[in-house]
Amino acid sequence: MTVLAPISTLAVPADEAFAALAVVKGELAAGHVVPYLGPCLFAQGSVSIPTTPEDLALALNAKAPVSGRIRGNLWAAAQFIESRRHRKTLTALMTEIFRAPMAPTALHHRLAGWRLPLIVDTWYDGTMRAALQESGRTDWGEIQGVTRVGEFREIWTRAYDASGAQVDLAAAASWTAILYKPHGAITPAANFLVSDSDYVEVLTEIDIQTPIPDVVKERRRKSAFLFIGARFHDQMLRIFARQIAKRSAGGHLAIAERALLARNEVRFLDEAGIELIDCPLVAAVELLIAG
């Protein structure tokens, strides 16, 4: 995992953090809280995929060298490859990087077992989908953000049922659980929002919520969000977190160690009204999956 600049702050006492987590766990299980998953969930052990935008940018650069000044900027590096080598090359490289499947963690399995109306997963892997499939459930489906490059119609998302077959977005209303992947994913169809051009129209429209499916807006309306393994040091990450959680019930929470957050992350949490549960991610996950 790429190391981000820490700041010096006072930590919340551990007992307060764990008491808060115990309450959140009950609300999660009851479907009153939307889990918002980030790739740092994988950073605790051996992984076969990049777990930060910076590491993904470097992985792309290793396969198709980009300009040195943008080497650590995912969105710009992806745009460089798309512009110089064609969109098909970028998609092929992303597919190669994320091809190796990640085994679902205990938290993924726990979330798959709860009857959650909505799960937001912001990375490109297919791990949460795999956990839902392994649960044996068929009452769920997935909505992914898709690129509009090469499209001549207004399209923001595609929907897939539990088997991976593409279906009409209207089918999502009947699903007990929706897995929402706003940036796309390797499975089932290798959809990726990753280059600057992918985000041009999305960022133009996202403030008025156009790219976010109506069924997602409806399911978040009475819920709070719990950010797990998510970072906010990059403006793109902050924009999506703010807009996806917009017009929901509020009372959002994020699990992270405050002393490891960058200054702009702390500022974002304060401005967005997201309360920080200040504890190690590993310890928090252990509590969430216990019992």
Q: How should each PLM-predicted stretch be described?
A:
Residues 2-291:
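SIR2/sirtuin NAD+-dependent deacylase catalytic core
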